[in-house]
Curated annotation (Swiss-Prot):
InterPro entries referenced in this protein's UniProt entry, alphabetically: ATP_syn_F0_a_bact/chloroplast, ATP_synth_F0_asu, ATP_synth_F0_asu_AS, F0_ATP_A_sf
Subunit-level organization: F-type ATPases have 2 components, CF(1) - the catalytic core - and CF(0) - the membrane proton channel. CF(1) has five subunits: alpha(3), beta(3), gamma(1), delta(1), epsilon(1). CF(0) has four main subunits: a, b, b' and c.
Protein name: ATP synthase subunit a, chloroplastic
Gene that this polypeptide is encoded by: atpI
Lineage: superkingdom: Eukaryota
Keyword Ligase set for record: no
Spans through the membrane: 38-58, 95-115, 134-154, 199-219, 220-240
Annotated localization: Plastid, Chloroplast thylakoid membrane
Amino acid sequence: MNVLPCSINTLKGLYEISGVEVGQHFYWQIGGFQVHAQVLITSWVVIAILLGSAAIAVRNPQTIPTDGQNFFEYVLEFIRDLSKTQIGEEYGPWVPFIGTMFLFIFVSNWSGALLPWKIIQLPHGELAAPTNDINTTVALALPTSVAYFYAGLTKKGLGYFGKYIQPTPILLPINILEDFTKPLSLSFRLFGNILADELVVVVLVSLVPSVVPIPVMFLGLFTSSIQALIFATLAAAYIGESMEGHH
C-alpha cells in the first residue's frame, strides 16, 4: 500500500502551504536584527509631515490668528476637548499623548490614499500606509496600555489593583483579561479597517480603473478619519477609566 508515502507527501504539502507568507516584505539587516524597512520608511515620511506642519504652525504666531494658525489652533482645541471629555479635569498632562496618537494615525491613514506610494519600487514588496501593517498598530496599542496602567498607579498607588476584585472577587480573571485584551482590540481594529480599505480600492482600480474607485477613495478617507478618532477616543477613555475607577 502507498498510504505512508501519500501521507508524507500530504504533510509536506501542508508544511509548504503553512510557510507561504501573505504579501512580501522588504527588510534591512542591521547587525543581528531584521528591520521592517517598509514600515520605517513610510513612518518617517508621516513623522516628517507632522514635524513640518508643527514647524509651520509655530514659526510666526500672531495675536490675531491667520488662516493657517486658525486651522492648527482648531486641531489643538479639538484634541483638548476630546481629552477633557474622556479623561476629566485632570486631562492636561495627557493632551500631548492623545494628540500624538490621533495625529500620527490620522496622517498615516490618509497617506495610504493620497500619497503615491506605489511609484516607489522596492526589491521586495511595496510601500503602503504605516497603519496597514500590524507591527505599527501593535506598537501604537502597547504604549496606550502602559499609559492607562501608569495613570491608574500614579493616581491611586497599589490601590489601583483593587478594581480587579470589584464588584466581586469572582470576576478577577475576567477583569484581568479585559485589561490585557484592550491593546489587542485597538491594534486589530485599526489594522483590519485600514488594510481592508486599501485592498478594496486596489481591487476596484484593477477592475474599473477610471471613475468608480473615486467615491470609494473618498469613503476611505472618511473611514480613515473615523478610525483615528476611535483609537484616540478609546485611549483617552481607558486612561480616564483607570484614574476614576469606574466601568
